[in-house]
């Protein structure tokens, strides 16, 4: 019998090994996704969960940011809107969209989840608006948003050219320690409230105006509507006209 050459025996052995490996692979179950793939982060949120956002906008999600900020519109005329304690972006979104359609550059924001340092929430929204192209900014808000605006206005620099307070008043725990705190802000202030506001004592807005050393406009209407209720109440036309005139004058 003829003997096989060593080279032929090596070739046969290699072929056998390859056959075994292929067969083993075919019988093995499909490998599970890698641990890294399983931990892939979900896509970052690009808009708030409420409303339909049209036109130019930019959304800063939370997390990773301490509080969410929505920027609407463009240009140098900036407005920061702070909602009530029970609201945020979604609460003021209709107003923000209306202002953006009128040519204003608007920032709306949520309050941080830890319910602390609300002034920092408005400051972050203001900084985001300035970074997005605003040059002159009016801080505005309703109830908590109003008192926080009154409290932080003097600390945010010369870009802040006015404050609109709708049902704002002093609250040491939320960012406006005392009525006298506004004395350090020299810019114009619009103060809107009802005579029988259910949150702050009668005369609060007038006392804030008296403590303010800059120009101020005081609008006090009959009734007990508070914050956003005033924009839809029986004196809404007077209030909205005062807000429009203030924005036109300062921006």
Where are these regions (language model features)?
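Conserved alpha/beta-hydrolase
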Residues: 96-115
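Short beta-strand/loop motif that positions the catalytic acidic residue
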Residues: 185, 191-193
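Short alpha-helix in the alpha/beta-hydrolase fold that links the catalytic acid
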Residues: 178, 201-210
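Gly/Ala-rich beta-loop-alpha elbow adjacent to hydrolase catalytic centers
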Residues: 141-149
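Alpha/beta-hydrolase active-site loop
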Residues: 114-132
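The serine-hydrolase catalytic nucleophile loop
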Residues: 85-95, 111
């Amino acid at each position: 019998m003829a003997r096989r050459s060593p080279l032929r025996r090596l070739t046969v052995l290699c072929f056998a090994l390859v056959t075994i490996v292929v067969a083993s692979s075919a019988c093995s179950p499909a490998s599970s996704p890698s641990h890294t793939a399983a931990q892939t982060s979900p896509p970052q949120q690009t808009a708030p969960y409420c409303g339909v956002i049209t036109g130019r906008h930019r959304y800063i999600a939370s997390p990773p940011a301490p509080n969410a900020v929505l920027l609407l519109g463009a240009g140098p005329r900036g407005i920061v809107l702070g909602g009530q304690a029970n609201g945020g972006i979604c609460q003021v979104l209709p107003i923000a969209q209306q202002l953006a359609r009128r040519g204003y550059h608007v920032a709306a924001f949520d309050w941080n989840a830890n319910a602390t340092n609300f002034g920092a929430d408005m400051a972050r929204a203001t900084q985001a608006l300035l970074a997005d192209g605003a040059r002159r900014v009016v801080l505005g808000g309703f109830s908590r948003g109003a008192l926080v605006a009154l409290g932080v206005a003097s600390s945010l620099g010369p870009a802040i050219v006015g404050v609109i307070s709708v049902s704002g008043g002093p609250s040491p725990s939320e960012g406006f320690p005392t009525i006298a705190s506004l004395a350090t802000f020299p810019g114009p202030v619009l103060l809107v409230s009802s005579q029988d506001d259910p949150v702050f004592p009668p005369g609060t807005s007038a006392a804030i105006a008296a403590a303010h050393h800059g120009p101020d406009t005081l609008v006090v209407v009959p009734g007990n509507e508070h914050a956003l209720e005033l924009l839809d109440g029986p004196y809404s036309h007077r209030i909205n006209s005062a807000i429009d005139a203030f924005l036109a004058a300062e921006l």
